[in-house]
Amino acid sequence: MSAPVIAIDAMGGDFGPHCIVPASLSCLAENPSLHLVLVGQSSLLEQLVAKHPGVDRARLKIVDAPEMVTMDERPAQALRGKPRSSMRVALEQVRDGGAQACVSAGNTGALMALARQVLKTLPGIDRPAMVTALPTRGAPCLLLDLGANVDCPAEQLYQFAVMGAVAAESLGRQQPRVALLNVGTEEIKGNQQVKLAAALLQQAAGLNYRGFIEGDGLYRGEADVVVCDGFVGNILLKSSEGLAGMLVAKVEALFRRSIAARIVGAVALPLLRRLRAELNPAQYNGASFLGLQGIVVKSHGSAGADGFKAAIRRAAQDVEHDLPAQLRDRLGQFFRVDGSSGGTDDVTARDGWPSN
């Protein structure tokens, strides 16, 4: 496999280039085969890179983009008012062959709209979905959508399930178990969209559909792919991250309560460090946009250096597996592909996506 080349929107996120550039350079140093394209205000990026004299400049390129998309900007403004934004230029690097993937911590709605306009969707796909892996009692579970589509008809949930199954297969899962997130496992439970999606999935030959799953079943590892709309998925993801942080803090506080507790804590320190590492949301940062004719990974806007590095690693993994090609090869098995891009509708029609 050729060395992965990843375009970085260096101006996005809550912390901007002062976090993203050092994180990117650290990732570059840790991965000898990796090549990065930093996109943003070139004079500032050069200054930040100069603070790291050991950087292998043969594997680093800086592309100027004088404009930036703010975290509270509406997608329509990003699409029509900023033709030289770092987000757009990074996506254009993928479209034009200068990079194989794009990573951004910027505004989610703007990234979705720009990605659909610049890269287009795969034939048969109406809208891309954001997917990430969540830890369970067993192997990690893929959850989608995570906020790119807050309202989803049944057909879109069906498409998400297909894309999630293909993504799970690319990670080595055989016949991945697919489930719809619902308020109960009984067939009578759920809203109309979920019930209609279930009917579609039950008829899908070649898809290992297991029915409805509740939130606790996800963490028990009862499915390899869990599908929901972006409204539910975004709340579930961020609630899970908050819960993980609280649990780690509670455990650490317990071992500081007394001298005896501190002694026990010192003995258990290796296990505590392992628990903290396994529950650390940063290592799961980076949601892939499935359904595009190119690879795009969204980092949390609030991610620190470790989280952003995880998003870069996710992009490199997607490049290795060539997810768009795998999806393109499999879509016709599950629904009619008519050759249209699936992305010709007005990408600014919905401005209500979450910003991070």
UniProtKB/Swiss-Prot annotation:
Alphabetized GO MF terms: phosphate:acyl-[acyl carrier protein] acyltransferase activity
- Pfam families (UniProt xref): FA_synthesis
Cellular component, GO annotation: cytoplasm
SUPFAM superfamilies associated with the record? Isocitrate/Isopropylmalate dehydrogenase-like (SSF53659)
- Which UniProt keyword terms apply here? Cytoplasm, Lipid biosynthesis, Lipid metabolism, Phospholipid biosynthesis, Phospholipid metabolism, Transferase
User: Which BP terms in the Gene Ontology apply to this protein?
Assistant: fatty acid biosynthetic process; phospholipid biosynthetic process
Q: Which Gene3D superfamilies match?
A: Isopropylmalate Dehydrogenase
- Name the top EC class: transferase
Q: In which pathway does it act?
A: Lipid metabolism; phospholipid metabolism
Reaction equation(s) it catalyzes? a fatty acyl-[ACP] + phosphate = an acyl phosphate + holo-[ACP]
Keyword Transferase attributed? yes
Where it sits in the cell: the answer is:
Cytoplasm
**Source superkingdom:** Bacteria
Q: From which residue to which does the signal peptide run?
A: none
Q: Which EC numbers characterise this protein's activity in its record?
A: 2.3.1.274
Instruction: Family membership, please give it.
Output: Belongs to the PlsX family.
What does this chain do?
Catalyzes the reversible formation of acyl-phosphate (acyl-PO(4)) from acyl-[acyl-carrier-protein] (acyl-ACP). This enzyme utilizes acyl-ACP as fatty acyl donor, but not acyl-CoA.
Q: How does it assemble?
A: Homodimer. Probably interacts with PlsY.
Looking up HAMAP family in the UniProt record yields: PlsX (MF_00019)
* Protein name per UniProt: Phosphate acyltransferase
